Amino acid sequence: MIQTGRNLLYRLLLALALALVPSTAWAKVEVSFHSFNGSLLGNRFPHTFVVLKGTLDDTGEAVDDNWGFTAKSVTPAILTGPVEAEIYHEKAKYVTSTNSHFTLTVSDATYRRMLAEMNAWANAPGKTYSLDTRNCISFVGRIAELGGLKVDYPHNLMRKPKAWPNHIATLNPELHARQIK
């Protein structure tokens, strides 16, 4: 009986020690999908983008960034065809005022595929932003696909950066995402 009690005590102490020791095995990167309603006063148009936070398992490197795909300059040309594009990194204070639709936890490998995809969009030559066919929704959709989500692009949502993530949430009920009005 005393031996059994000691074994139990040792197991409890080992479990406690393991729980208190920092481990990179607990590291993770979370990718949150955000939208912004737009503001005429702030000269901001509706937009969707991703926020990435966490720590890589294999290196311990901290991840704290956000990516959105947008036109380099907003002019009437955006209404008539492709224009030059960029990956835009929002200021932290701006991110806190946006709608967070849902979050995925991804592996280091998936994060790196997302990073490579973002770099490909950032470095694509020519006029790559198209309001109706290759916009912020297209970019965020590609990141969502890399995260394993089912994604589609209904034409009636291609200019609705808040409604589109709600649509993606309905295609992926495992997210348990709330609809943002």
Task: Show which residues each predicted segment covers.
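Bacterial N-terminal signal peptides that target proteins for export
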Residues: 2-13
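Serine/threonine-rich, low-complexity intrinsically disordered segments
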Residues: 4-6, 26, 72
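Mid-length scaffold segments of soluble, non-membrane domains
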Residues: 85-130
